[in-house]
Amino acid sequence: MITLQPMDRQMCHAFYREFENDPAVGHYYEFRYDPAWADAYFDRNQIRDRLLFAIVLDGRIIGECKLKDMDLEKHTCRMGIHLLNDSVKEKGYGTRAEQLMLRHAFENLDMETVFADAVLGNLRSRHVLQKVGFYETGQDDTFAYYRCDRENGT
């Protein structure tokens, strides 16, 4: 069963020690685990307008999901997700994590709209966004942009 747990520093290190770039987006940046980078990344995500969660399957961290750019006056935020590697993809885990994040954003944080983006070539990510209720609002040379409103989210 997939659960979301607030990510702490130790969980962040455990996740990124095993993280592998998705081949669909890996050409944008090369990732190598570095403890100093993981500490800085964790610290950057400890600000007021962000919430960082570990995606946990049977006690194992298989991804991270975050809400960022939270605007409590406009009731909007952005959602992002990273899964550990290809071994945990195409099994419904990302879909379930995004459903849980949307539910948290809409029901617990009183958001009206959640935005997201996906690299144009990352067809899996784009499919999952649409599956959980997002619709495409535009594209640029690199990304497709999406939004999900409370009434059409899962």
Model-derived regions: residue spans:
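Acyl-donor (CoA/ACP) binding surface of acyl/acetyltransferases
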Residues: 1-14, 18-22, 49-52, 56-154
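Conserved GNAT-fold acetyl-CoA-binding loop/helix
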Residues: 23-42
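Short loop/turn motifs at secondary-structure junctions and domain boundaries
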Residues: 43-49
